Design a protein with these regions (language model features):
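Short glycine/threonine/proline-enriched tight-turn/helix- or strand-capping micro-motif at secondary-structure
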Residues: 14-25
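Short structural boundary motif marking the start of a folded domain
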Residues: 1-4
């Protein structure tokens, strides 16, 4: 597959080209919950520029062995292949990918509490693992897929896989605390409104 690869950090951001296109091996299913996604679009955000300049090298690459790597953590595309335990997704389904992959497939305590950002063995494609979405294919976990309606194209939603899903999660968690009476019955809505 073709991929855009970062080979060196550029602290001064003066290089004319930061990534180069090269052939990489296609990702392979390893776990029964793995999914290979054909990337339709990958967003670029300020985080990517911080990666290029090495601003987070002390966090994401403390040993200095992460490069070369394929960047890209804001990804959307179509399901290409699914592991044997994957249900609810099939080849061709349009999806957006949550950027954090839990190494425990959601079974660790933090994931069960809805704190995936603190997942045990968590991986962040294009940030702390070498395989990101600036490629034709990306391996992820079924837990990280959100099926898209067919009226949405991956190019229209890829940037939302980071900032958009982050905001969505905050709203989803907050709503149960803001209007708790709405969670029980529709009759309670009249009581809440006054």
């Amino acid at each position: 597959m073709k991929a855009q690869v970062l080979h060196k950090y550029d602290p001064e951001m003066k290089e004319k080209v930061w990534v180069t296109e090269q052939e990489m091996p296609d990702p392979k299913l390893e776990k029964s919950s793995d999914v290979i996604v054909k990337i339709g679009a990958a967003g670029v955000c300020r985080t990517d520029l911080h990666i290029v300049e090495g601003a987070w090298k002390h966090i994401q690459d403390p040993k200095g062995d992460l490069l070369p790597m394929v960047m890209g953590h804001e990804n959307a595309g179509w399901v290409e292949e699914v592991g044997k335990d994957v249900t609810g997704f099939k080849k061709g389904d349009p999806v957006i990918l949550h950027p954090i992959i839990s190494g425990t497939d959601g079974t660790c305590l933090n994931c069960r509490r809805g704190l995936d950002q603190h997942a045990d063995e968590g991986a962040f494609p294009g940030l702390n693992i070498k395989e990101g979405g600036y490629a034709e294919l990306l391996k992820t976990s079924v837990r990280n897929l959100i099926k898209l309606p067919t009226v949405l194209a991956p190019k229209d939603v890829a940037p939302f896989s980071d900032a958009g899903l982050t905001a969505y999660r905050v709203v989803k968690k907050a709503t149960r605390h803001l209007l708790p009476c709405l969670l029980y019955t529709s009759d309670a809505a009249d009581e809440c409104s006054g």
